[in-house]
Every structure is written in structure tokens, then in C-alpha cells.
Regions:
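Short alpha-helix
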Residues: 169-194
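Core SAM-dependent methyltransferase catalytic element
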Residues: 188, 233-249
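Conserved class I S-adenosyl-L-methionine
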Residues: 121-158
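C-terminal helical/coil "lid" or tail adjacent to the Rossmann-like core of SAM-dependent
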Residues: 197-227
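A short acidic, Gly/Pro-enriched loop at the edge of an enzyme's catalytic core
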Residues: 80-92
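Conserved N-terminal segment of class I S-adenosyl-L-methionine
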Residues: 1-80
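A short beta-strand submotif of the Rossmann-like class I SAM-dependent methyltransferase core
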Residues: 91-97, 123
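A short glycine-rich, Lys/Arg-flanked "PGG" loop and its adjoining helix->strand segment in the class I
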Residues: 105-120
């Protein structure tokens, strides 16, 4: 009970910071818009790790879940064991959730099971580039290693904190470095979109820290500048990726 309460308090603190920072909310709004562009318009969407519930502003028919209780979510569930029927959702979305998973292979199997044929999963996750690797290693508590077997099944760790423990290098290893292995393990799934995101706007918001170095009024304009620069600088310093996976019809 104490562990569950601690995790709930951590999530509440994170959500409270988010709700106070308009600049950060504007960045996340742009993330949800990017995911929405690549999702199916029909059927229901499931969000894994919904936290503040702000996805409802972009997705109207959406069911929100998180690993600990939140007043903003519809249910509590473990992403490794999703409590839904087969082929139940047309879309699955998540932001900064995948790299916290202890066994991402199990999650992808579950996601494939509950997606309809033609269903899509859109994830926004950390991306390891020459510059971002420095930032993640020195300014984040999580590991940042891509020299791993991302498909390895790990024994359950009761001491693991699902909100804080993770590996920022996991998504890069899983979807980029081991892309061919991914498609062999999941022949029913196909990566249909990979896009580099985020250069400087998100760091200037301070993320979930209690400071912000930019006025919220500038965020949308600077995001446009960032989108212009990404084709030039993305391979060198992009901080995030958008990966869209489709279940074959």
C-alpha cells in the first residue's frame, strides 16, 4: 500500500506541475496533434500512461489508462497485461511510456492483440542522437543505453518504480537499431512512420521541473521554427521520435 501511495503521489506531483505550465501543455498539444494525424479516424483510441488527461482535447473517442490511479484516467492497468478484449481499439497512443517498460516485448504483443486489423499505435519517445545522448546521460536519472537486447524478457522487479525507472535508449534500440528484428518478431505489424522530433523548445520549458525559460506565447511560433530545422538538425540533435506502427489488415 505504501508503495502504491508513493507512486500516486509522484504522479499527482507531476500532473500538478504540468497543469501549471502553459508552455509545457502547448508542447504536449503539438505531440497529440502529430499522433492524431497518423491515427485512424474510426473506432476508439486507448492511451497508455495518460497522466493529465489532456489527450481528450485532441482525441474525442478515447479511453485513458495509467499504471497508478489518477482522477484523469478511466482505469488503472499494467501495460504488460492489458485488460481488454481482442481487437478492441482502432488506435493506441502513448507519450514517454514505452521507455519505462520492464518488458516492452510483452507490451507490443498485448498492443497487437487488442488492436483491430488496420489499427495503429503511435508512440512519442526519447530518441538517442549525438547531442541528445549527452543531455539524457547528464540531465536525466534514467539509463540511456542502446547496446541492449530490447526484446529480452526480464524477471519482475518488485522494487522497480514504473514512473521513474527506465532506459531512454530503449525506443532507439527497439524501433531503429533493431527494426528488422522487430518486423521478424511481429510479422503482423509494420512501422509505417518514423519521424524525429524536438530540438530546443521542450528543454526550454523545463519539462516537469518547476521552472520555465520561455513565455508560453512563444511556444507555437518556436515549434514552427523547430519543424523547419528538424530536417537539417534532426539526425544530430533531435530529442524524440514519433513511431507509428500499423497492424496488417
Amino acid at each position: 500500500m505504501q508503495k502504491t501511495t508513493t507512486h500516486k503521489n509522484e504522479l499527482d506531483t507531476k500532473v500538478n506541475v504540468f497543469l501549471k505550465k502553459t508552455a509545457l501543455q502547448n508542447v504536449y498539444e503539438s505531440f497529440y496533434e502529430k499522433m492524431y494525424e497518423h491515427c485512424n479516424e474510426f473506432g476508439e483510441t486507448l492511451e497508455i500512461g495518460s497522466a493529465s488527461g489532456k489527450s481528450r482535447n485532441s482525441f474525442k473517442n478515447i479511453f485513458l489508462s495509467d499504471v497508478v490511479f489518477s482522477h484523469h484516467s478511466d482505469t488503472v492497468c499494467d501495460a504488460h497485461f492489458l485488460p481488454f478484449k481482442n481487437k478492441n481499439f482502432s488506435n493506441i497512443i502513448a507519450i514517454d511510456t514505452f521507455h519505462h517498460l520492464q518488458n516492452p516485448l510483452m507490451f507490443v504483443k498485448e498492443a497487437s492483440r487488442i488492436l483491430t486489423n488496420g489499427g495503429r499505435m503511435a508512440l512519442i519517445e526519447p530518441l538517442v542522437t549525438p547531442i541528445s545522448q549527452i543531455i539524457y546521460k547528464f540531465f536525466h536519472d534514467e539509463d540511456c543505453s542502446t547496446n541492449i537486447n530490447p526484446f529480452q524478457i526480464n524477471a519482475p522487479d518488485q522494487k522497480r518504480n514504473p514512473l521513474k525507472d527506465g532506459n531512454n535508449g530503449l525506443p532507439t534500440a527497439f524501433f531503429l537499431k533493431k527494426k528488422d528484428s522487430f518486423h521478424k518478431k511481429f510479422p503482423e505489424l509494420k512501422i509505417v512512420k518514423f519521424q524525429r522530433l524536438s530540438l530546443f523548445v521542450y528543454p526550454l520549458t523545463g519539462g516537469y521541473r518547476n521552472w520555465c525559460l520561455m513565455p508560453s506565447l512563444l511556444v507555437k511560433s518556436l515549434l514552427k521554427v523547430e519543424n523547419f530545422l528538424l530536417p537539417l538538425l534532426g539526425r544530430l540533435m533531435a530529442l524524440r521520435m514519433l513511431v507509428v506502427i500499423e497492424k496488417r489488415k
